[in-house]
């Protein structure tokens, strides 16, 4: 019986640690995105996204499909650092869906000379080749 209890506790601890490690990786990636954005570096900001035609970004104008289309939309909407401003994410929750997918809910805020803006977002992350990537982004 002791062996069974020890085994169960070990599995619970290992599973919990794996989730925490993955959550920390996701939070770290979002922090890197903030840093890149705040330097005016959209290409490095985009490294958090899945570089694939199946990426979906949903904003006020509806869905945009594909990494390059999403990149071009960011570059068009934020042509320089005065429009980009300073980005801050406030993470509300980071929840595992399974071993390879996480669902993140948060708020975003841009402090800018041309006027502050902000809203909420939901992100679907997938572990691809050992790295967590955003495969779906719904920002409002």
Task: Annotate each language-model stretch with its function.
Residues 54-65, 78-82:
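A short gly/proline-enriched turn/hairpin at secondary-structure junctions
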Residues 4, 8-9, 15-48:
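Short, low-complexity N-terminal intrinsically disordered segments enriched in polar/charged residues
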Residues 33, 45-46, 54-55, 70, ...:
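Hydrophobic pocket/interface hotspot
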Residues 61, 93, 107-108, 123, ...:
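A mature extracytoplasmic/lumenal domain signature
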Residues 51, 97-98, 128:
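Structural motif
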Residues 71-114:
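Surface-exposed, charged secondary-structure patches
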Residues 118-140:
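Short beta-strand edge/turn micro-motifs at domain boundaries
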């Amino acid at each position: 019986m002791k062996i069974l209890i020890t085994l169960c506790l070990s599995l619970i601890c290992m599973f919990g640690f794996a989730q925490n490690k993955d959550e920390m990786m996701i939070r770290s990636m979002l922090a890197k995105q903030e840093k890149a954005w705040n330097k005016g570096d959209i290409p490095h900001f985009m490294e958090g996204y899945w570089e694939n035609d199946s990426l979906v970004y949903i904003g006020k104008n509806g869905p945009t499909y594909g990494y390059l289309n999403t990149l071009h939309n960011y570059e068009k909407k934020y042509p320089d650092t005065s429009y980009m401003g300073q980005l801050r994410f406030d993470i509300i929750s980071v929840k595992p869906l399974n071993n390879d997918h996480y669902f993140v809910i948060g708020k975003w805020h841009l402090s800018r000379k041309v006027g502050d803006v902000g809203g909420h977002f939901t992100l679907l992350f997938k572990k691809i080749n050992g790295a967590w990537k955003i495969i779906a982004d719904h920002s409002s």
